[in-house]
């Protein structure tokens, strides 16, 4: 077998490979040299560290932002919730507006410059948020952090380019795991480090944001030193230069793109809905259909969910994907969703009727089973790669998907928590209405999977990187 020498990469190299040459249809041979595979997975590990910074920056302020608004801006207690909702959402709204421009910039400048610039800007702006002394400054720094939203789209495509069909499922499992880790660590930093006194007594909310920023700066330096540019000069050929630009409209008209974007968005909406409501549900008293947990048990269940997700994503998903494929996993997880929601309601009923032994058997089992639906999001990452009409369209397609997710992250939590709160005013069994609505949305998702494109059902199609 002929071994082609690796091409030298720099920051001005084309972002995505041409369709000419080996693997010109986007298909990468499964065989990869062990040394090259080890190097690629090292790159994936670094990129996953970068992936964790976005949710870390997003969620760090959640434990203290309400008190910060009341203390810093002098807002009436009755109005704090309104302003905190705006400040929390501004990150995602700004990110949504600039996601596609960041992808375009990466097409022109290369992956690595956009990654480093985004990470550095996100880290610094997140750190400065804790030093805000007015409501206007809080809004400004939150929007500034969202402006540097190019990290996620760049990391997602670079992971695709650093993996082969054999390693892609595991790589995107790590990608999803990194998001989970950032989501868990962010609130822990915010809750544990705010109002420490001492040197921070004049800025009581600065320490957690500085800590989050320090994480970001550390990862930025590591990526600057060790992450390789994935856009190689050899990939940029006259064929690619002469090919038409892949505009957003042209990508949307490509076969299979619209169904996959919708299914991805629908899956994320379900995830955001449950993630937002679950802490409130755990806190709600059993007489209103909740679990009535103390903060300790709430954190125990949330932490247990994170551990269970880690096991499902890292140990279960890669071999399961190899055996069943993306489409079958998505359909199977819709069934798991229904069982999980029914078991959650069943556990609540047991608690309400003081059947505590049965409750403590069913509730943890439901939690572990329900955590498996995190694999749905990893499967959708692979589906996006599969429907990309061209290597040159992959960055923009991912940016479009992430823009949709940013919008949902901005509006879904408030929408579904308000819905859940309104159902608590109903008489029994009306306070279980929210779970019926969520189950209905799962059935809609299962129905839309009928339009899952054929190429998603098959083995992963590789768009970014080739091996001889």
Swiss-Prot record:
The region called Disordered is annotated at 1-30
- Keywords assigned by UniProt, alphabetized: Cell membrane, Glycoprotein, Membrane, Transmembrane, Transmembrane helix, Transport
Q: Which GO terms describe its molecular function?
A: transmembrane transporter activity
Which Pfam family would be a valid example here? MFS_1
Q: Which InterPro entries match?
A: MFS (IPR011701), MFS_dom (IPR020846), MFS_trans_sf (IPR036259), Tet-R_TetA/multi-R_MdtG-like (IPR001958)
Q: Which GO terms describe its cellular component?
A: plasma membrane
Subcellular location, in the record's words?
Cell membrane
Induction comment: Expression is under the control of the azaphilone cluster-specific transcription factor azaR.
CDD domains in UniProt: MFS_SLC46_TetA_like
Q: Which residues are glycosylated?
A: 228
Main localization category: membrane
**Lineage top rank: taxon:** Eukaryota
Provide the topology term for how it sits in the membrane: Multi-pass membrane protein
Q: Transmembrane stretches, by residue range?
A: 43-65, 80-100, 112-132, 135-155, 174-194, 207-227, 257-277, 296-316, 329-349, 357-377, 387-407, 429-449
Q: What positions belong to coiled-coil segments? A: none
The task this protein performs is described as: Efflux pump that might be required for efficient secretion of azaphilones.
Q: Which family does it belong to?
A: Belongs to the major facilitator superfamily.
Q: What is the designated name of this protein?
A: Efflux pump azaK
Phylogenetic classification of the source organism: Eukaryota, Fungi, Dikarya, Ascomycota, Pezizomycotina
* Gene assigned in the entry: azaK
């Amino acid at each position: 077998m002929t071994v082609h020498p690796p091409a030298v990469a720099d920051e001005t190299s084309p972002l995505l490979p041409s369709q000419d040459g080996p693997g010109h249809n986007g298909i990468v041979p499964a065989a990869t040299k062990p040394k090259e595979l080890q190097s690629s997975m090292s790159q994936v590990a670094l990129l996953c560290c970068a992936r964790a910074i976005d949710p870390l920056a997003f969620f760090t302020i959640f434990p203290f932002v309400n008190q910060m608004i009341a203390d810093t801006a002098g807002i009436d207690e009755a109005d704090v919730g309104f302003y905190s909702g705006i400040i929390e959402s501004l990150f995602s709204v700004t990110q949504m507006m600039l996601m596609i421009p960041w992808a375009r910039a990466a097409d022109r400048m290369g992956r690595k410059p956009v990654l480093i610039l985004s990470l550095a800007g996100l880290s610094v702006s997140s750190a400065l948020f804790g030093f805000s002394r007015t409501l206007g400054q809080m809004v400004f720094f939150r929007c500034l952090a969202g402006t540097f939203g190019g990290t996620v789209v760049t990391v997602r495509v670079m992971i695709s380019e650093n993996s082969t069909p054999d390693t892609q499922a595991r790589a995107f499992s790590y990608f999803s795991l990194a998001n989970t880790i950032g989501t868990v660590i962010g609130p822990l930093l915010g809750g544990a480090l705010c109002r420490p006194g001492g040197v921070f007594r004049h800025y009581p909310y600065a320490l957690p944001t500085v800590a989050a920023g320090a994480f970001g700066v550390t990862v930025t330096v590591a990526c600057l030193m060790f992450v390789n540019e994935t856009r190689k000069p050899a990939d940029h050929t006259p064929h690619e230069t002469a090919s038409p630009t892949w505009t957003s409209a042209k990508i949307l008209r490509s076969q299979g793109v619209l169904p996959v974007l919708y299914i991805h968005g629908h899956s994320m909406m379900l995830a955001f809905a449950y993630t937002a409501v679950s802490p409130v549900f755990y806190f709600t008293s059993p007489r209103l259909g909740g679990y009535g947990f103390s903060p300790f048990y709430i954190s125990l269940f949330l932490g247990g969910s994170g551990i269970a997700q880690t096991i499902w994503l890292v140990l279960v998903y890669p071999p399961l994907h190899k055996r069943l494929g993306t489409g079958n996993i998505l359909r199977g997880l819709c069934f798991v969703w229904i069982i999980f929601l029914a078991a959650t309601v069943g556990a609540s009923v047991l608690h309400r009727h003081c059947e505590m032994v049965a409750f403590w058997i069913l509730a943890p089992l439901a939690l572990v089973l329900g955590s498996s639906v995190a694999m749905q999001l990893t499967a959708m990452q692979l589906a996006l790669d599969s429907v990309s009409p061209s290597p040159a369209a992959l960055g923009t397609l991912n940016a479009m998907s992430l823009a949709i997710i940013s919008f949902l992250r901005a509006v879904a939590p408030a929408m579904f928590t308000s819905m859940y709160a309104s159902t608590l005013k109903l008489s029994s069994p009306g306070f279980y209405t929210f779970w019926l609505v969520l189950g209905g949305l799962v059935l809609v998702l299962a129905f839309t999977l009928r339009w899952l494109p054929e190429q998603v059902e098959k083995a992963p199609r590789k768009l970014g990187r080739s091996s001889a």
